[in-house]
Amino acid sequence: IRRNTRPTAGARNHRKSQLLEDVYAYNDYSYRGRGAACEARAAVTSDPRKGYLISEFGGQQLPTKPFDDETHRLVQALRYAAGINDSIAQQGVAGSFGWCMADYNTHREFGSGDRICYHGVMDMFRNPKLSAAVYASQKTPRSPSDIVLEVSSGMALGDLPGGVPTACWVFTNAESVRLYRGNDYIAEFTPDRHGRFAAMTHPPIEINDFVGSLLEKYEGMDPASAQMTAAILNEMRRDAMELSPLSKARILSLRLSWNE
């Protein structure tokens, strides 16, 4: 008997199953950090005429403790952002629920060996992890107190493997972010509206320049050499062991010019 009430939904973790509810709700844990963060609706639902909802995604695939290292916490946050973005971008998806809000107790055969599942964007005591800022930053601010600005890196080199910095992202609902080193202005960054997170209301912002014009100001380098050197340093900050062919060519060019 069909009642005049809100649509019903269940939860399932396999494709093309029998639909007994009004909405096909699917636990989509397909994402492994590359490619699309959710499966195509047409490949999952058994009835494309009915509504479709991603009932779970995210945290279960990358358990993250609040005391995990900076890189691990950032990966979790970016995975949540990818899930949110791709569910918004895909036509016909009513919405998505990240699994889950907070870490929780579990039995000894599950979780991380301590009877705790670290799937949440908050810990068990509701203290936010970095990934909580992904959700908080999607609110459009109506007053200064509504501004969210969470930087993924603590900039503590001694806490990073080999003392090598990695990617730095800002989760914010501000229109732009300005970076200073002391009183020296470095650069202003805005969301990439055509990038990986373009479907989000407020995409996270990658900070990819930590040098700006400081080499010209303090080292007396000419603009061309300063620009090339800054590009190399910024790339080394992200991955010092795997420089691109372009950066290697820049290093060679700088060596030749300095030897002249």
Specify the residue positions occupied by each region the protein language model found:
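Substrate-binding/catalytic cleft of secreted carbohydrate-active enzymes
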Residues: 1-131, 144-159, 183
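Carbohydrate-binding surfaces of carbohydrate-active enzymes
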Residues: 86-260
